[in-house]
Amino acid sequence: MKKSARRQSRELATQGLYQWLLSNAPSGEIDAQLRGALGYDKADKELLEAILHGVIREHATLVEALAPSLDRPIDQLSPVERAVLLIATFELTHHVETPYRVIINEAVELAKTFGGSDGYKYVNGVLDKLAAKLRPAETQARRNG
């Protein structure tokens, strides 16, 4: 199945954030490397930039929003799970036009693609809790049918 431009952007953002989390390289350096990555030409570049730079810029705020939904300190998570959760937290708070279920589903798929064998289950559980806090009206409406 062909990946959407938005999915491709999220995959590249995950790779870029993984690199940033491990190396703390400047975002411009990460940008340059991503431009040479497979699939860059098919990505929604505006979304990729918004996510990558937004997560790096607002890292501390996103971690603060995410922390109450975690069962352990964020630095004990794998870098892949951290990157995926930070992307989803950024999208939940900044891309309110995107339904929360879409954001969670995309995050689960990223965790399946890049993470450990059961990491996607953890990501799903954390984001369900987080979405209920960040988007209570939307999540309640979905639960009420």
UniProtKB/Swiss-Prot annotation:
Keywords on record: RNA-binding, Transcription, Transcription antitermination, Transcription regulation
Record SUPFAM superfamilies: NusB-like (SSF48013)
Top-level taxon in the UniProt lineage: Bacteria
Pfam families per record: NusB
Molecular-function annotations in GO: RNA binding
GO biological process, one term: DNA-templated transcription termination
Keyword flag Transcription: yes
UniProt keyword annotation of Metal-binding present: no
GO cellular component: cytosol
PANTHER family registered for this protein in UniProt: ANTITERMINATION NUSB DOMAIN-CONTAINING PROTEIN, N UTILIZATION SUBSTANCE PROTEIN B-RELATED
Family, as annotated: Belongs to the NusB family.
Name of the protein this chain belongs to: Transcription antitermination protein NusB
Name of the gene: nusB
